[in-house]
């Protein structure tokens, strides 16, 4: 035994005492928790005495309860009543008219009307997986631009919106007719694969989801560049990755737009990811010089306290009212006029079997030769950019 130290038996005895105290503390915590769940009138004198002697534990448990309730409220969807929503839309319309430089930030909530599930909503992919429920969705290539997508395109045509920054990978902004220069798809586009060996990078727009074989840190699609023969890669930025491609991420334009914006409209985004991008929020500017923020979302967002106005409503409902208030007609989406067909690079001979995803057709009756895609149906989400997100969340759930 070292001088002044404890013997082995003394250390073991001290450890037993420590564990006993911890167990006694846990048991006391359980007792106090059970008592706090009772109404005050139902508590016995002995229970009242125990609470009085355990003030620190009572404070800790009450704090935990408040935090749980707060998190629960944040996940709830709240809808403004129709009259209140119309009043807020009138205020939003005034802001849109008076904005000198309006930038729109969009999230998964603008595509739920196209049958593409979001992640964090009450019926979102991660929410359902956390509840142990299965997740299914229709073929994502069957999705079409929603009323919100088409409204944004019209607002850009009317020079009321200068730029769109999107978290979505579904390509619906591109397919709505919004110019490539007006979009920053920060997390990629499921229809675009690129050759990073060519300078500048050579893009290939396809009429099918190119991400069937790709995953986190594994981006090769199985096809090669028509010019240099290098393996093509998808453009998706998965959770845990940092996007490095110039296009379609277009970070340079997003940063420039944010720096010039005097108004930002957030549509259908939880902002839990976008809030982590300081360049989008002009945080280096004094508060008085930052853009005014307008948020459309049914749930709480971490930017609510900074918003000039929060509208609790579905994106399509709000945009329908907004366009009416602005006196603008919402263009109907036309599959025949979808820009993706003029932008797309056809597969070369021998590449037809390089994917099994359903290809887009100009009409639903038309099917390209060799297309092995299944008809529109609700089925488990497997593979691709969306399926990988589901798989990753499932793995996290098992670990925790």
Curated annotation (Swiss-Prot):
Keyword Nucleotide-binding belongs to the record: no
Gene3D superfamilies named among the record's database cross-references: 2.20.28.200, TPP-binding domain (3.40.50.1220)
Binding partners and assembly: Interacts with UBTF and the RNA polymerase I complex. Interacts with components of the B-WICH complex, such as MYBBP1A, SMARCA5/SNF2H and BAZ1B/WSTF. Interacts with ELK4, leading to stabilization at target promoters for H3K18Ac deacetylation. Interacts with histone H2A and/or histone H2B. Interacts with DNMT1. Interacts with SIRT1.
Note on how the cofactor is bound: Binds 1 zinc ion per subunit.
Chemical reaction(s) catalysed: N(6)-acetyl-L-lysyl-[protein] + NAD(+) + H2O = 2''-O-acetyl-ADP-D-ribose + nicotinamide + L-lysyl-[protein]; N(6)-glutaryl-L-lysyl-[protein] + NAD(+) + H2O = 2''-O-glutaryl-ADP-D-ribose + nicotinamide + L-lysyl-[protein]; N(6)-succinyl-L-lysyl-[protein] + NAD(+) + H2O = 2''-O-succinyl-ADP-D-ribose + nicotinamide + L-lysyl-[protein]; N(6)-propanoyl-L-lysyl-[protein] + NAD(+) + H2O = 3''-O-propanoyl-ADP-D-ribose + nicotinamide + L-lysyl-[protein]
Modification(s) after translation: Phosphorylated during mitosis. Methylation at Arg-388 by PRMT6 inhibits the H3K18Ac histone deacetylase activity, promoting mitochondria biogenesis and maintaining mitochondria respiration.
Enzyme class: transferase
Designated name of the protein: NAD-dependent protein deacetylase sirtuin-7
